[in-house]
């Protein structure tokens, strides 16, 4: 528990948008920013558990900060932060795909959105206990390496067929257009 408290304290010492807002609120109210941050986290948690807009809030948490951090990573000269956020987006995408098929059932479970939000926060957590990194290296990457050649072959075949169909449709549309123009004259 002390490790979590120390990380929380270190977070509050960093200079970022959240800590600046907490500092301004602390100056106006006289309430310590640790209590303000704890209160905000508690309200957020309660809203995720019982609030009407929990799906939207959870989606914003899972998308807004990672999108911002991804843009910062793209603009930075380092490749390592790019890899961190690409890994997150791979896991996020696969989670979204799995959720598409199970959401109707899972959304009826109590505290589903709180659990989903906790999972997404786990996936974007900094440091060695980053959930996206763990899931990618333990599950996704081994499956990818095992099956990527077969998937590449299927995708190549499908894209070739799609191009053939599109070319045929374009030809047919051109013929129909020419015929219609000739009939109109």
Swiss-Prot record:
<dbReference type="GO" id="GO:0050908">
    <property type="term" value="P:detection of light stimulus involved in visual perception"/>
</dbReference>
<dbReference type="InterPro" id="IPR004345">
    <property type="entry name" value="TB2_DP1_HVA22"/>
</dbReference>
<keyword id="KW-0968">Cytoplasmic vesicle</keyword>
<keyword id="KW-1133">Transmembrane helix</keyword>
<comment type="subunit">
    <text>Interacts with STX3. Interacts with clathrin.</text>
</comment>
<comment type="similarity">
    <text>Belongs to the DP1 family.</text>
</comment>
<protein>
    <recommendedName>
        <fullName>Receptor expression-enhancing protein 6</fullName>
    </recommendedName>
</protein>
<feature type="transmembrane region" description="Helical">
    <location>
        <begin position="89"/>
        <end position="109"/>
    </location>
</feature>
<dbReference type="GO" id="GO:0005789">
    <property type="term" value="C:endoplasmic reticulum membrane"/>
</dbReference>
<keyword id="KW-0812">Transmembrane</keyword>
<dbReference type="GO" id="GO:0030665">
    <property type="term" value="C:clathrin-coated vesicle membrane"/>
</dbReference>
<keyword id="KW-0472">Membrane</keyword>
<feature type="transmembrane region" description="Helical">
    <location>
        <begin position="43"/>
        <end position="63"/>
    </location>
</feature>
<dbReference type="GO" id="GO:0005783">
    <property type="term" value="C:endoplasmic reticulum"/>
</dbReference>
<keyword id="KW-0256">Endoplasmic reticulum</keyword>
<dbReference type="GO" id="GO:0001917">
    <property type="term" value="C:photoreceptor inner segment"/>
</dbReference>
<comment type="function">
    <text>Required for correct function and survival of retinal photoreceptors. Required for retinal development. In rod photoreceptors, facilitates stability and/or trafficking of guanylate cyclases and is required to maintain endoplasmic reticulum and mitochondrial homeostasis. May play a role in clathrin-coated intracellular vesicle trafficking of proteins from the endoplasmic reticulum to the retinal rod plasma membrane.</text>
</comment>
<dbReference type="Pfam" id="PF03134">
    <property type="entry name" value="TB2_DP1_HVA22"/>
</dbReference>
């Amino acid at each position: 528990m002390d490790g979590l408290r120390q990380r929380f304290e270190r977070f509050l010492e960093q200079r970022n948008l959240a800590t600046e807002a907490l500092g301004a609120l602390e100056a106006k109210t006289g309430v310590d920013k640790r209590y303000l941050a704890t209160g905000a986290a508690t309200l957020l948690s309660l809203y995720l558990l019982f609030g009407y807009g929990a799906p939207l809030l959870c989606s914003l948490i899972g998308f807004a900060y990672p999108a911002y951090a991804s843009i910062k990573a793209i603009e930075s000269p380092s490749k390592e932060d790019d890899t961190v956020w690409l890994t997150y987006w791979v896991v996020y995408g696969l989670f979204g795909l799995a959720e598409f098929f199970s959401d109707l059932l899972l959304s009826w479970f109590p505290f589903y959105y709180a659990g989903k939000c906790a999972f997404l926060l786990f996936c974007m957590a900094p440091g060695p206990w980053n959930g996206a990194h763990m899931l990618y290296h333990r599950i996704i990457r081994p499956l990818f390496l095992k099956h990527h050649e077969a998937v590449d072959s299927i995708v190549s075949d499908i894209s070739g067929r799609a191009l053939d169909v599109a070319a045929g449709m374009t030809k047919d549309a051109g013929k129909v257009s020419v015929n219609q123009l000739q009939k109109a004259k």
